[in-house]
Regions:
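Intrinsically disordered, low-complexity basic tails/linkers immediately adjacent to helix-turn-helix/homeobox/MYB/SANT
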Residues: 50-68, 107, 111, 116-118
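Core beta-strand-centered patch of the WYL/Sm-like small regulatory domain
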Residues: 93-201
Length: 282
């Protein structure tokens, strides 16, 4: 088994390690994928410079090991280390969603084939097999990653699934069903991972809550209206739980009622955890 050991800049190493964590993929697998992806493509050239950098090492898989020497020689690059740095440099010079397309090329390709053939596909997502009608793949701007928007037969509802967490895709002979074309088009135009379109949440902030709202930008829902201290957001319940839960007592959920109940139940569970801790300490 051939071991790759190459010194790269701190910046290059940081992006590789970040992608490994973000996409839950070992560094070695990333290295094998990008070698195969770039073996027949032009590479950007990079100079390491007069500094030590970081050492990246992993093993080539059997298939890549068999083709590596021929590919390296044909590249015309003087050393293997330089060749690997060029591959990595070319890879990291893509935006994250483009790097995702490289790492999960097979999944993207199969989904695209399913959509083009207008057939349902089966996907393995979080260990479960789901039959879905795939409508489109869209990048979530806030996350810089791609989602498959589809109708899921298992949930009998529209769903967004992270492409990077789809483990496998299978084709079927069943035709795609478009139950509500207008809704699908509207979701495409107003896309967000939580499918907030047409869903609303009303809240009331304390003075401190307003200050937090103005500062906390990550996952902040779209503001539709603000009147008499009441804020109305375009927001799905899932997004509301993610965003507003961090405000604790500085926000009051007014609508919808099911969100209020869910948040109350979660807070009760949290209180119970701390009460149990206090009982143990007595």
């Amino acid at each position: 088994m051939k071991k790759v050991r190459v010194t790269i800049s701190d910046f290059m190493n940081e992006i590789i390690k970040s992608d490994s964590e973000y996409f839950k993929m070992p560094v070695g697998r990333i290295g094998n994928i990008i070698f195969k992806y770039y073996m027949d493509k032009n590479l950007n050239k990079v100079e390491l410079g007069n500094f030590s950098g970081e050492v990246l090492q992993f093993n080539l898989n059997k298939n890549n090991e068999e083709i590596f020497m021929d590919t390296f020689v044909r590249s015309g690059v003087e050393t293997e280390a330089e060749y690997w740095r060029n591959i990595i440099f070319t890879y990291i010079n893509n935006l994250r969603y483009k790097r995702e397309e490289i790492l999960f090329e097979k999944i993207f390709r199969k989904i695209k084939e399913g959509m083009e053939s207008k057939r349902k596909i089966k996907i393995k997502y979080h260990k479960y097999i789901r039959l879905v009608s795939p409508y489109f793949v869209k990048v979530a701007d806030d996350e810089n990653r791609s989602y498959l928007f589809c109708y899921c037969e298992k949930n009998n509802d529209y769903r967004n699934y992270r492409i990077s967490e789809i483990e496998e895709v299978w084709f079927t002979n069943e035709n795609i069903e478009k139950k509500d074309k207008k809704y699908i088009d509207d979701v495409y135009k107003n896309f967000d991972p939580f499918l907030s379109y047409k869903n609303t949440v009303k809240v009331e902030f304390t003075e401190k809550g307003v200050e937090l709202y103005e500062k906390v930008l990550t996952n902040r829902p779209k503001l539709l209206d603000k009147k008499d201290g009441i804020y109305t957001f375009e927001c799905d319940n899932k997004l509301a739980m993610v965003y507003f839960a961090q405000f604790f007592s500085n926000v009051k959920i007014l609508e919808p009622s099911e969100l209020k109940e869910r948040l109350k139940n979660e807070l009760k569970k949290t209180i119970k955890i701390y009460e149990n801790e206090e009982e143990k300490d007595v």
